[in-house]
Amino acid sequence: LLARLDDNRGWLAKALAGAVIALGHPSNPFVADADSASALLLADGDDIHLIASDDVTLTRAESFDPFRRLFSVEWTPSPATKVGSNWGDTADRGALLAAAQMIGLAQRCIDLAVAYAKDRVQFGKPIGSTQAVKHMISSAQVKVEFARPVVHAAAAELPVATLASRARVAHAKIAAGAAADVASRMAVQAHGAMGMTWEVDLHFFLKRAFALNYAWGSPAVHGETISARIATLPTGPDATFASEVT
């Protein structure tokens, strides 16, 4: 986003040198890691404002995920702080990044569950040798494997910036969110009651999956994008199984 602004006031170079720029996009009610940022990109309607951290007032917000530092930001927009008026595909990029994170999170949960199922012995044999545990883990892996190519396809088409590409991002966000939800819950279940204690880290994965699922657009919001795309497609027997042309 900084690179596309005509007036980034030198913050692009500062960001490349390591300065933190927090992003307050209209789709997110709070700004993540605003307390560690040197400057913030904030929205006032469709306008983009670049504000130094000294010119805002931050209030810490509670988060379901204890490792996400979220803040509400009080600030005053002015012509001097305005640097643009087009958020472009920022929301799509944020949603795609969240989807990619959830795929990685889901896979890590499965890997932890597999390792524990191999190591935990009950009634003289590893719990992973039972069909119930095998099927539970396998179902989560299938969910991830079906979501992963959806995320890859969305990433490949993101630069096109059409309704079709936005629908692919929406599909990726929904699919990855569902996979992360299933995998994180499965991993907790595979570990038994211990899975929701501070003795293991699984509850952090579950909480992050929940938080990311609603960051950069909820499933309902992305479902509306997909619905809008479907409404543009031809209907009828000749079009039902036709390949989509973007």
What is each stretch, according to the model?
Residues 15, 31-35, 63-67, 88-91, ...:
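Solvent-exposed alpha-helices and their adjacent loops that cap or buttress functional pockets
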Residues 65-94:
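A short, charged helix-loop
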Residues 1, 11, 36, 69, ...:
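Internal, well-ordered alpha-helical segments in soluble enzyme and binding-protein domains
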Residues 1-60:
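Glycine-rich flavin
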Residues 90-246:
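Alpha-helical interface subdomain recognition
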Residues 58, 83, 123, 127:
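Short clusters of hydrophobic/aromatic residues that line enzyme substrate/ligand-binding pockets
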Residues 46, 54-55, 77-79, 102, ...:
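A broadly conserved detector of short glycine/acidic/proline-rich loop/turn motifs that flank catalytic sites
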Residues 27-29, 58-64, 93-100:
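Flexible, glycine/proline-enriched loop segments at strand-loop-helix junctions
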